[in-house]
Amino acid sequence: MPLSSKVSQAPWSLTGKTAVVTGGSRGIGRAIAIHLARKGVRKLAITYVRDLASAESALEEIRKEGIETGIAIQADILNASVGRDLIAQALVGLETSTIDILVNNAALLDPINTPSVEDVTLENFQELMQANCFAPVSIINACMPHLPPSGGRVINISSVASKTPNPGTIVTYGASKAALDSYTRSMAGLFAKDKTATFNTVCVGPTVTDSFRAVSQLYPGEFIKEVAKSFTAADRVGVPEDIAYIVGFLASEEGRWMNGACVSANGGLREALPALS
């Protein structure tokens, strides 16, 4: 069955859809989950690792948008069985056999405790690759049989670090995101036709999240202002809602002709390194 060319009367709407957003308890994931609910998603699962209070707070906001069912699932992207376990719990908790939208947002970035590239160990390398590439791929594989007959959406949150030179402690993180970009493109080529689904990544630039704040601690001065001036054409750093709006577009019928893409979400990236020098 080819990707539909039928014109929708409300291509922006996600009314009645079911979605899973990993890492949806805070930051970008939280903003994505809330935005999907506002666009009409009916059933929504978010994941968290340890902070149940943040997950419950996110669900409270999501339910204010009129969602029918919202659940939080504890899931660790360093767990080898995260894909199988998460999707099984989501299907049961949401009382559904279909997941229309999968957003892989959860990621591992710990520049304070990650060794620089010249000191990287196999353990460090494997941990980042497992969290940022294997985990989302395994979640996609577990979700694949439960995508709808047409119009499924798989959206992976990546980073500009996958495409730029990076400071020493972020090199392996960038490599793990580049691997995810590659997997996403290949999945679009391999499965888009049979699944009539789209597979895209959103390459996020500097955005004010917990991870961004952690990175900022490594550098002196007014880091965020320097990033805004040196990294982006806009005079500010991104906020989670900036990313959520792009994901909402890709998840809707409006984004149906984008497949295998890495969508830049960076406010007009200038240079990768000047703010860090």
UniProtKB/Swiss-Prot annotation:
E.C. no: 1.1.1.-
Stored PROSITE patterns: ADH_SHORT
Keywords for this protein: NADP, Oxidoreductase
Top-level EC class: oxidoreductase
An example molecular function term from Gene Ontology annotations: oxidoreductase activity, acting on CH-OH group of donors
GO BP term, pick one: secondary metabolite biosynthetic process
List of catalytic residues: 158-159, 173, 177
Family annotation (Pfam families): adh_short_C2
Reactions it catalyzes: yaequinolone D + NADPH + H(+) = penigequinolone A + NADP(+) + H2O; yaequinolone D + NADPH + H(+) = penigequinolone B + NADP(+) + H2O
Domain of life: Eukaryota
Record InterPro entries: NAD(P)-bd_dom_sf (IPR036291), Sc_DH/Rdtase_CS (IPR020904), SDR_fam (IPR002347)
Annotated metabolic or biological route of this protein: Secondary metabolite biosynthesis; Alkaloid biosynthesis; Mycotoxin biosynthesis
Residues annotated as binding NADP(+): 28, 76, 105, 173, 177, 209
PANTHER family referenced in this protein's UniProt entry, alphabetically: NADPH-DEPENDENT ALDEHYDE REDUCTASE-LIKE PROTEIN, CHLOROPLASTIC-RELATED, RE15974P
Role of this protein: Short chain dehydrogenase; part of the gene cluster that mediates the biosynthesis of penigequinolones, potent insecticidal alkaloids that contain a highly modified 10-carbon prenyl group. The first stage is catalyzed by the nonribosomal peptide synthetase penN that condenses anthranilic acid and O-methyl-L-tyrosine to produce 4'-methoxycyclopeptin. 4'-methoxycyclopeptin is then converted to 4'-methoxydehydrocyclopeptin by the ketoglutarate-dependent dioxygenase penM through dehydrogenation to form a double bond between C-alpha and C-beta of the O-methyltyrosine side chain.
Protein family (similarity comment): Belongs to the short-chain dehydrogenases/reductases (SDR) family.
Protein name as it appears in the record: Short chain dehydrogenase penD
The organism of origin for this protein: Penicillium thymicola
The encoding gene: penD
